[in-house]
């Protein structure tokens, strides 16, 4: 699969995870609505689905895994930061075929696109600390 298709899958997944976090709707409904309303040309749809459903199913586990590395309470995170961190923690935890440096870099790039001004620095700091524990380098 082309790296660009995976990057687009991550971008779409972060948006859908964000929507799910805010709405509280069933993940299948969020997925269906997202795919019917958004431009998904050039997106690795299978990877998008894996990320979205994987994060939803494992959200509590992912949150618990990242909590020791947060400089503030999980509840104080912005929803965009939380969506990006959950996605990256999912990749670090469940997708060993994705090099940890790629997972971290992709999360930083997502934070630059979707996050507040310095959220990419926060995301980088959390993931740099979490990666050695979550996945043996």
UniProtKB/Swiss-Prot annotation:
It comes from the Bacteria. One of its GO terms (cellular component) is cytosol. GO terms for molecular function: RNA binding. Gene3D superfamilies: NusB-like. GO terms for biological process: DNA-templated transcription termination; transcription antitermination. Keywords: RNA-binding, Transcription, Transcription antitermination, Transcription regulation. InterPro entries: NusB-like_sf, NusB_fam, NusB_RsmB_TIM44. Coiled coil: none annotated. Involved in transcription antitermination. Required for transcription of ribosomal RNA (rRNA) genes. Binds specifically to the boxA antiterminator sequence of the ribosomal RNA (rrn) operons. HAMAP family: NusB. Belongs to the NusB family. This is Transcription antitermination protein NusB. The lineage of its organism: Bacteria, Pseudomonadati, Pseudomonadota, Gammaproteobacteria, Enterobacterales.
């Amino acid at each position: 699969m082309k790296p660009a298709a995976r990057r687009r899958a991550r971008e779409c997944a972060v948006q859908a995870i964000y929507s799910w976090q805010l709405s509280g709707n069933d993940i299948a409904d969020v997925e269906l609505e997202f795919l019917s309303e958004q431009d998904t040309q050039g997106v690795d749809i299978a990877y998008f689905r894996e990320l979205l459903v994987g994060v939803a199913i494992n959200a509590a586990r992912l949150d618990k895994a990242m909590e020791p590395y947060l400089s503030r309470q999980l509840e104080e995170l912005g929803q965009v930061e939380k969506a990006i961190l959950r996605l990256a923690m999912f990749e670090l935890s469940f997708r060993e075929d994705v090099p940890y440096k790629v997972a971290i870099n992709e999360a930083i790039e997502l934070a630059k696109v979707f996050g507040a001004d310095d959220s990419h620095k926060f995301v980088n700091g959390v993931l740099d600390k979490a990666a050695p524990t979550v996945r043996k380098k």
